[in-house]
């Protein structure tokens, strides 16, 4: 259960996992953005909150079947209370408020973080692989989000579509928007792609607009 996760985090912080005689390992890695919406989704707390059935950055259906903002629901208080305890006990880096995802990853790769929440790509090169190269004995495992009670935890999943192109019904040639997209995709990724012209500068710097 989530209670086990909390105790494991405490164990990382208090039982000297690297054997250097110091309590210098943090049980739970946290970056200053706190949730994925505010920073790179590495060492963010979305999964932590979801274990308490709390959803800090999305709209949910409340008990009355109405739309309600997840960040102000009662479940948030329980999650925040346990986070406060972890922070007070030294399980969370006291300087997390000034460390972004990259900075936290440096601690992770140095073997100074026991666990963290993140996305699937967090195991890629640089985010976790550097630590494995430095210390082959490091062994990371992926664990499903666990619930604080008997109700299964549900993860916040970003909606697949993030941008829309809208054309006025009064537009004389609405199909031009589709043609423009087709041209961009063709010149960047199609059979006649010219990435050196459309996807990078003469200095070979990537261009994304």
Regions found by a protein language model. Give the residues of each.
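Extracytoplasmic/secretory soluble proteins
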Residues: 1-209
């Amino acid at each position: 259960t989530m209670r086990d996760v909390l105790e494991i985090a405490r164990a990382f912080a208090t039982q000297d996992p690297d054997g250097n005689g110091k309590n210098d390992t943090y049980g739970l890695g946290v970056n200053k953005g706190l949730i994925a919406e505010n920073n790179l989704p590495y060492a963010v707390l979305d999964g932590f909150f979801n274990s308490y059935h709390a959803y800090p950055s999305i709209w949910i259906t409340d008990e009355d079947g109405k739309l309600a903002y997840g960040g102000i629901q009662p479940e948030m208080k329980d999650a925040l209370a346990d986070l406060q305890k972890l922070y007070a006990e030294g399980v969370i880096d006291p300087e997390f408020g000034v460390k972004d995802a990259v900075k936290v990853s440096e601690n992770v790769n140095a073997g100074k973080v026991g666990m963290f929440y993140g996305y699937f790509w967090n195991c890629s090169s640089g985010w976790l692989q550097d630590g494995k190269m430095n210390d082959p004995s490091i062994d990371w495992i992926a664990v499903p989000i666990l619930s604080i009670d008997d109700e299964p935890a549900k993860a916040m999943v970003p909606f697949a579509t993030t941008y829309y192109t809208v054309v006025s019904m009064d537009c004389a040639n609405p199909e031009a928007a589709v043609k423009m997209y087709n041209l961009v995709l063709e010149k960047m990724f199609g059979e006649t792609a010219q990435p050196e012209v459309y996807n990078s500068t003469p200095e070979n710097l990537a261009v994304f607009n």
